[in-house]
């Protein structure tokens, strides 16, 4: 079993924020992969399903971003899983918009949701880093991540999420390189 947590802020006013692209990714997977309906558990929303032979618990913490790790840690301990069984989908300023990279381990890189997750489960979880680009100046980061995607980005955002959905079996089977390759191939066509 694996836990795939999307990071974001709860509430409809944040739904289309760049910071919520992790929620968008797991919402897409729940819908497109016929996961169970979302229900409340572990200080968040969960949806259980299967990809290939792997059971996956999708998780959207109901806490704000800065406390995301509490829900992830609670679910991980309940299922007696290791941090290596956890994947976190999150926005990434240092990656070009709508690009996807996978990384195992590492620090928070200034991301408060990752900082909280590290505090609750350690660093050895896998991250699916969803590029949102950088506003250019550090002073503009807060407003940028809490801003909605621009209308001009909606097609690219949908393309990225669809590519993730199509390539997701590779992630479920721990073939991160093939997952990224399949996303890149699907986005070129």
UniProtKB/Swiss-Prot annotation:
Chief location bin: cytoplasm
GO biological process: protein quality control for misfolded or incompletely synthesized proteins; rescue of stalled ribosome
Superkingdom of the source species: Bacteria
Transmembrane segments: none
Site positions (Stabilizes the basic form of H active site to accept a proton): 91
Catalyzed chemical reaction(s): an N-acyl-L-alpha-aminoacyl-tRNA + H2O = an N-acyl-L-amino acid + a tRNA + H(+)
Subcellular compartments: Cytoplasm
Alphabetical UniProt keywords: Cytoplasm, Hydrolase, RNA-binding, tRNA-binding
Any one GO molecular function term: tRNA binding
Pfam families the UniProt entry points to: Pept_tRNA_hydro (PF01195)
Active-site feature positions: 19
Marked site positions, Discriminates between blocked and unblocked aminoacyl-tRNA: 9
EC nos: 3.1.1.29
A Gene Ontology cellular-component term: cytoplasm
UniProt keyword annotation of tRNA-binding present: yes
InterPro entries (alphabetical): Pept_tRNA_hydro, Pept_tRNA_hydro_CS, Pept_tRNA_hydro_sf
Residues engaged in binding tRNA: 14, 64, 66, 112
Assembly and binders: Monomer.
NCBIfam families in alphabetical order: pth
Family: Belongs to the PTH family.
Role, per record: Hydrolyzes ribosome-free peptidyl-tRNAs (with 1 or more amino acids incorporated), which drop off the ribosome during protein synthesis, or as a result of ribosome stalling.
Protein name: Peptidyl-tRNA hydrolase
Classification of source organism: Bacteria, Pseudomonadati, Pseudomonadota, Alphaproteobacteria, Sphingomonadales
């Amino acid at each position: 079993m694996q836990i795939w947590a999307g990071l974001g802020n709860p509430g409809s006013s944040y739904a289309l924020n760049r910071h919520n692209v992790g929620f968008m990714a797991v919402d897409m997977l729940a819908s497109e992969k016929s996961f169970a309906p979302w229900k409340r558990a572990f200080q968040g929303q969960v949806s259980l399903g299967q990809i290939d032979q792997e059971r996956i618990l999708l998780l959207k913490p109901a806490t704000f971003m800065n406390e995301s790790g509490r829900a992830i840690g609670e679910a991980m301990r309940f299922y007696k899983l290791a941090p290596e069984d956890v994947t976190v989908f999150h926005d990434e300023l240092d990656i070009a918009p709508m690009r996807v990279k996978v990384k195992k381990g590492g620090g928070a890189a200034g991301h408060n949701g990752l900082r909280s997750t590290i505090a609750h489960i350690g660093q050895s979880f896998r991250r699916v880093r969803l590029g949102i680009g950088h506003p250019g100046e550090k002073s503009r980061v807060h407003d940028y991540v809490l801003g909605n995607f621009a209308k001009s980005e909606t097609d690219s955002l949908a393309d990225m999420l669809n590519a993730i959905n199509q390539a997701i079996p590779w992630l479920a089977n721990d073939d991160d390189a093939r997952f990224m390759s399949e996303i890149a191939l699907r986005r070129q066509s």
